[in-house]
C-alpha cells in the first residue's frame, strides 16, 4: 500500500500545475466520465484535479485495504469496532424486514422491527390525539432532550423534512447552559407538552440536568405526577422507572448502534412524531437504498466510496486539511453541524487500529453554511484566500414551493456559478480590463488588477438530486455515513469509538466542586486564575 501512496504523491507533483480548465479542454466527455449516480442522485466530481491515473490509483488504494470486504463485514454484524468489541449495525436499523443480520448468533432484525412498530404506534396515537395529556387534551408540542447523537440528527432531520410536518411541533434542548432550556420552555404550555428524554444510559450529565429542569417545569403546572407527559429513549429501564416513565414509553436500542449513527431508530422518535411513520419509513428506505448501492456498486461508480477517495486525495495528497459543505437548500442548514460530529468524531483519530501512531493525516476540519448565506460571509476566503479549501455543494432540481420557482432558479444559478467561479478564477489581464472599464488607468489599473483577479483552480464536487424528499434525505445522510467509513478504512482507524471526548468530561466532574468554592490549589495557574475570575 505504501507504494500506492508514493505513486499518488508523485503523480500529484507532476500534475499540480495543470489548471482544472485544461482537463475539460482535453476531454469533451469529462463531466460524463467524472460523475456517478445512485438512482436519481448525481455526484459531479469533474471539477477536481483527478485524472484517470489518479482515480485508478485511488481505487487501487481502496482495493489494497479490501474496502469491499470491510463493507460486507460491517453490514453483516462483524465486531469491527475493535476498541469496544462491538458490531456496527446502524445499517440494520433501515434493513428490509425480511433481512437476516446476526450478532452473536441472533438475528437482530425482528427486534428492530418490533421497536419500530412500537414507535409507530406511539407516534400515531400522539399525532391523532388518542394519547392525551394529563388533562385530557391533545399534545401540541414535543421537547426532545438529548445531546450529541441524541440531538444533532433529529434536529437536522426535522428541519430538513419540514414540508412533511403534520404532527406536534418539535423542539430540542441539548446544551447544559440553562439559557437553552429556559428559552425553549418559555414559549410552551406545560399542559400540552410531551418531554422525550434521550440518553442510552440515562447518565449523560447534560441531558439528565435538563431533564430534571423540564420535569420541575411540568410539575409546576400539573402537580407531582407528570408521567403522562414523559417518554424516554434509553436502555436503562431501572432509571427510567425511577423517573416515573412506564416501560411502554421507553424505546431502547442496542450497543451496536453508535450515538452519531442512531437517528434511524428510537433516537429518531421526534422525527417520526413530526412527519409520521410513513414518511419516516421513506427516510429509512432512502438510506437502505444507499446502503445497497455502497455494498454492490463497483468502486468506480460507488458514490460513498468515490466521495471518500476524493476526500483522501484532497487531505493526504493535496494537503488540504479542511473541507466546506455548502448545501444550497435552507432546510439542510443543520447538515454541516451534523457532519461535524459524524466526520470529526468518527475520524478525528491519531492512532491506527493497533494503537500505533498514524503515518499520515486523518479526518479534516468539516464546516459550512447554507447557500446563498455563505456567499456573503466566508466565500471571500474560498475564492481569494491563501488556503485552498475543497467545497461540496448540494442542490435540488426543484423546491417544495412551486409558487416560488423563480427563487429556486436563482438559488440554482448561484450554486452553479460558485462552483464554476472556483474553478475558472479570473486572470490578471482580465482583471486589468475590468479595472480600466471602471475608470482606473496606468499604475492604478495594475494595482486594482491584483485585487480583482481570482486564482481559480479550486476543487469542488456537487451533489444534485431531484427534490429534498424523505427518501432523498435518507440517501444523503447514508451517503455521508459511508463516505466517513471509506476514509476511516483507508486510514486504518476505528471510526466508531470516541475516546477523545472522555478526558474533558472527567475533568469537568472534578472541577465542579471547585467552581462551587472547593479548594483548587492543586490546579495549574491558568485554571486557578479562571476559577477566581468566574467565581460568583
Swiss-Prot record:
Domain of life: Bacteria
Enzyme category, top tier: isomerase
UniProt function note: Catalyzes the reversible isomerization of glucose-6-phosphate to fructose-6-phosphate.
Subcellular location: Cytoplasm
Top-level taxonomy: Bacteria, Pseudomonadati, Pseudomonadota, Alphaproteobacteria, Rhodobacterales
Annotated organism of origin: Ruegeria sp. (strain TM1040)
EC number: 5.3.1.9
Active-site residues from the entry: 345, 376, 505
Catalytic activity: alpha-D-glucose 6-phosphate = beta-D-fructose 6-phosphate
Gene Ontology molecular function: carbohydrate derivative binding; glucose-6-phosphate isomerase activity; monosaccharide binding
CDD domains xref list: SIS_PGI_1 (cd05015), SIS_PGI_2 (cd05016)
Name the record gives this protein: Glucose-6-phosphate isomerase
